From Swiss-Prot:
It catalyses: tRNA(Thr) + L-threonine + ATP = L-threonyl-tRNA(Thr) + AMP + diphosphate + H(+). The lineage of its organism: Bacteria, Bacillati, Bacillota, Clostridia, Eubacteriales. It comes from Clostridium botulinum (strain Langeland / NCTC 10281 / Type F). It is found in: Cytoplasm. SMART domains: tRNA_SAD (SM00863). Catalyzes the attachment of threonine to tRNA(Thr) in a two-step reaction: L-threonine is first activated by ATP to form Thr-AMP and then transferred to the acceptor end of tRNA(Thr). Also edits incorrectly charged L-seryl-tRNA(Thr). The keyword 4Fe-4S does not apply. Homodimer. Its main location: cytoplasm. Residues 1-61 form the TGS domain. Zn(2+) binds at residues 333, 384, 509. PANTHER family: THREONINE--TRNA LIGASE, CHLOROPLASTIC_MITOCHONDRIAL 2, THREONINE-TRNA LIGASE. Its cofactor is Zn(2+). Binds 1 zinc ion per subunit. This is Threonine--tRNA ligase.
Amino acid sequence: MIKITLKDGKVMEIEEGIKISDIAMKISPALYKKALAAKIDGETVDLMTELHKDSSLEILTFEDEMGKWALRHTGAHILAQAVKRLYPEVKLAIGPAIDTGFYYDFEADFTFTPEMLEKIEAEIKKIIKENHKLERFELPREEAINLMKEKNEDYKVELIEDLPEGEVISFYKQGDFTDLCAGPHVPSTGKVKSVKLLSLAGAYWRGDEKNKMLQRIYGTAFTKKSELDEYLNMIEEAKKRDHRKLGKELDLFSIHEEGPGFPFFHPKGMIVRNILESFWREKHTKAGYQEIRTPLILNEALWHQSGHWDHYKENMYFTNIDDGDYAIKPMNCPGGILVYKSSMHSYRDLPLRLSELGIVHRHELSGALHGLMRVRCFTQDDAHLYMTKEQIKEEVIGIIKLIDEFYKLFGFEYFVELSTRPEDSMGSDEDWEIATNGLREALDSIGKEYRVNEGDGAFYGPKIDFHLKDCIGRTWQCGTIQLDFQMPERFDLSYIGADGEKHRPVMVHRTIYGSVERFIGILIEQYAGAFPTWLAPVQVKLMNITDSQYDYLKKVEETLKENNIRVEIDTRNEKIGYKIREAQLQKVPYMLILGDKEVEAGKVAVRSRKDGDLGAISLEEFIEKIKNEIKNKTN
């Protein structure tokens, strides 16, 4: 008999060699029906996996991220099987699960069309109905290569040949279809209840522009049709809110072929950006942070010393200055460390909180670029805090509260994830344990719920990630708190303790917006371009009905500007209804309409983007109203 510890702490004694699916049935028939995959000692596996030793076990359903992943991974295999049935000459490349579904890349001597997708989708439904079992098997390298050569799958052969010697080479078979895959998968194709193919795109093999362009089919999968329908509605809403579309319509930013991945901010976009950065500075000053600025370009040796060279070299840009090798910074932390090292520190100086709105550059493949969400140049709202081990808990609590204040202001719900030590980490077991426990204790002490994401920490320390949930249910990872014992060691950082001796400080890396550019993109989509008044590039659109109100309009404009209200005027010889519609399309919070009646009464007719016609009021009354709205940062 072996002992199995369940997620709730309950221990089961069961016979050795039992399959996880059978354990799920023993726990509950309802759980067995919903089960998609499992975690054994933190590793995600198939339900058909047999257990031969004492283990911790978590049964995964569609409510769990890795349960979704397993189902959608199987969805990708079903897509590939359907394509091969209909178009046998097509060659298979790769087909992973992704956050919102799955995709599969194909090489074909024809172009897939929307009509073909309908045909493929019909075949997918047949495969689901056939309910084929997914059977995993392993082969030695030569046999695996020969199997894929027999099937004329050149890309699979290349993948196998690139695997390290001794690597397990596994396949999954479902009916008449076999694919190279590490898994895990759901037990049968019938578990994938609802599938929808979403779009077509081009994708270079292995993301390299020098390689062949393949055809990518995107899809998604759910366990219920109602969930799929809800997701498809969300996609339609997301299209309306697409920040790339709204960014152009509202004249906020642009991206040009002369600089792919390098956004250009227009005057209105700069207003939004400057407000966000000013607010950030104000809150950080109150929280005891001191702002610094570090150079864009630093000697290559610095990145070797920090360890970033080993982990980020492929995503860095380089240059040569005076025969020396330099790198454009992909992160702000090494520069911030040099600021710390520039003077001696006492324990009385700690905690020391240094903040920086630092521009960083990271190379992204052209196919991964996406508006402001995925760029090659962005501003990271970093802060690096230096402290004693005893100060970790209180400092982390302070950061969590600051992050919470920011996200609530913008109307975001969020969830928290604690990520633990990855395989390619630096540092001792003891340091990692102290660091992880420090983050865990801070979260526990303020009653903040969190998930544990095993093995997803930074290479230098564990981290807390903050995932925003927007108004249509999508999640965005923005804020992060990363505890770091390694950088202080690598850079020989120290402070003088109360005993007069040198001690090593603990370092915390943290962001709130994450990337300022990306956060702006998220806000554009969160508000569908209709920024709250305090954040709107234009707060008031002032418009006259005829030329006879022009002089009064200019006086009103001047008064609004004197009160620091952002105003634009529309004096074109157009009908007032046309002007109002255009201002509404520009998402302006307030329109002030001036006709002869308003001139005579010394008033303004107010129209709100949100509430419609508010009637005629005095200019003073309107100014008081809008200034209160701006001051209170009303959403």
